[in-house]
From Swiss-Prot:
<protein>
    <recommendedName>
        <fullName>Sec-independent protein translocase protein TatA</fullName>
    </recommendedName>
</protein>
<keyword id="KW-0472">Membrane</keyword>
<feature type="compositionally biased region" description="Polar residues">
    <location>
        <begin position="56"/>
        <end position="68"/>
    </location>
</feature>
<keyword id="KW-0653">Protein transport</keyword>
<feature type="transmembrane region" description="Helical">
    <location>
        <begin position="1"/>
        <end position="21"/>
    </location>
</feature>
<keyword id="KW-0812">Transmembrane</keyword>
<keyword id="KW-0813">Transport</keyword>
<keyword id="KW-1133">Transmembrane helix</keyword>
<keyword id="KW-0811">Translocation</keyword>
<dbReference type="InterPro" id="IPR003369">
    <property type="entry name" value="TatA/B/E"/>
</dbReference>
<dbReference type="GO" id="GO:0033281">
    <property type="term" value="C:TAT protein transport complex"/>
</dbReference>
<comment type="subunit">
    <text>The Tat system comprises two distinct complexes: a TatABC complex, containing multiple copies of TatA, TatB and TatC subunits, and a separate TatA complex, containing only TatA subunits. Substrates initially bind to the TatABC complex, which probably triggers association of the separate TatA complex to form the active translocon.</text>
</comment>
<keyword id="KW-0997">Cell inner membrane</keyword>
<comment type="function">
    <text>Part of the twin-arginine translocation (Tat) system that transports large folded proteins containing a characteristic twin-arginine motif in their signal peptide across membranes. TatA could form the protein-conducting channel of the Tat system.</text>
</comment>
<keyword id="KW-1003">Cell membrane</keyword>
<dbReference type="InterPro" id="IPR006312">
    <property type="entry name" value="TatA/E"/>
</dbReference>
<dbReference type="GO" id="GO:0043953">
    <property type="term" value="P:protein transport by the Tat complex"/>
</dbReference>
Length: 74
């Protein structure tokens, strides 16, 4: 029950092709591929954008002095 032979998968593939058609499956594959590519490009852009921003933030706060006065409780 847990293992399927190659014939099971071929029958499932045939049913999917008959139900959806090859054009629809090709469009789904193209859309999925472009979505994955867009995700990878976005992750790459996010990785390059965050590194300089972190360095700039640290430099701007290092030159400032903050004075704080505390009040006793009670």
């Amino acid at each position: 029950m847990g293992t399927f032979s190659i014939w099971h998968w071929l029958i499932v593939l045939l049913v999917v092709v008959v139900v959806f058609g090859t054009k629809k499956l090709r469009n789904i594959g193209t859309d999925l591929g472009s979505a994955v590519k867009g995700f990878k490009d976005g992750m790459k852009d996010a990785a390059t954008d965050t590194a300089p921003a972190g360095q700039v933030a640290n430099q701007s706060t290092a030159d400032q002095t903050i004075d704080v006065q505390t009040k006793p409780k009670g």
